[in-house]
Swiss-Prot record:
HAMAP family given in the database record: AdoMetDC_2
Cofactor: binding comment: Binds 1 pyruvoyl group covalently per subunit.
Name of this chain's protein: S-adenosylmethionine decarboxylase proenzyme
Modified residues (Pyruvic acid (Ser)): S112
Subunit structure: Heterooctamer of four alpha and four beta chains arranged as a tetramer of alpha/beta heterodimers.
Pathway(s) where this gene product acts: Amine and polyamine biosynthesis; S-adenosylmethioninamine biosynthesis; S-adenosylmethioninamine from S-adenosyl-L-methionine: step 1/1
């Protein structure tokens, strides 16, 4: 897309929202409580603040204020207010390609708000536990929050991810013409690294004329030992392993498709 000469500030709002899910099976009530306590501590308000602070560096944001809170019995939230200084559009990379991974993050430039809320929960009887993190990165100006996508998914180990990206409002060029988007995008997947795309089955639902983009991701490989909490698969009978595998896989598909699947 040809670079635009704008009349004043870039008034477009770009919002990236996504849910990240981690799934686990805990055999006993004590193990379920242990998983909830473990995941609640792993992603407490301080850890989330560190992750979002790095996110600010990726999208080029100046932090104005940080509000964080751990909740009882579980859960946490962090909201960071950020500002954008005038940036020379010639210095901004608007091409459609993956953002940096955690080990390659560097600070540059400067951006509206970034927030995260966590929701640990468990099935009352079935041993299934899920951890959900809701994240929103919303910016005003020339820099896309999609640049933070790679980093956030890598930081929050994810079995299932649902992502929404939307560009709202309009900005004017020097001739007064309105522009409702200022960068090319065909799919959110184009902002992911090849190694990430190789790990997930993905599907897009995009409404191009409304500048709305949606991608769902489901981890391809299933290894039972990665989903057991304080129990090794070899400690179970073959029948128990099959029952637990079926439960986990059904749970993951229901979350991925957003609907309950009847038992066969």
């Amino acid at each position: 897309m040809k670079k635009l000469k704008l009349h004043g500030f870039n008034n477009l709002t770009k919002s990236l929202s996504f849910c990240i899910y981690d799934i686990c099976y805990a055999k006993t009530a004590e193990e379920r409580d242990g998983y909830i306590a473990y995941i609640d501590e792993l992603y407490n308000a301080n850890r989330l603040t560190e992750i979002l602070t790095e996110t600010c560096s990726i999208i080029g944001a100046n932090i104005l204020n940080i509000a964080r809170q751990d909740y009882e019995p579980q859960g946490a939230s962090v909201t960071i207010l950020v500002s954008e200084e005038p940036v020379d559009p010639k210095l901004i990379d608007q091409t459609e390609h993956p953002g940096p991974l955690p080990e390659t993050v560097v600070a540059h430039l400067d951006k509206s708000h970034i927030c995260v809320h966590t929701y640990p929960e468990s099935h009352p009887e079935g041993g299934l536990c899920t951890f959900r993190a809701d994240i929103e990165v919303s910016t005003c100006g020339v820099i896309s929050p999609l640049k933070a996508l790679n980093y956030l998914i890598h930081q929050l180990e994810s079995d299932i991810v649902t992502i929404d990206y939307r560009v709202r409002g309009f900005t004017r060029d020097i001739n007064g013409m309105k522009h409702f988007i200022d960068h090319e995008i065909n799919s959110i997947q184009n902002f992911m690294s090849d190694d990430m795309k190789s790990l997930y089955d993905m599907v897009d639902v995009n409404v191009y004329q409304e500048n709305i983009f949606h991608t769902k991701m489901l981890l391809k490989e299933f290894d039972l030992k990665h989903y057991m909490f304080h129990t090794r698969p070899e400690e179970l009978t073959a029948e128990e392993r099959k029952v637990i595998t079926d439960l986990l896989w059904k749970e993951m598909r229901e979350i991925y498709y957003g609907r309950n699947i009847p038992a066969v």
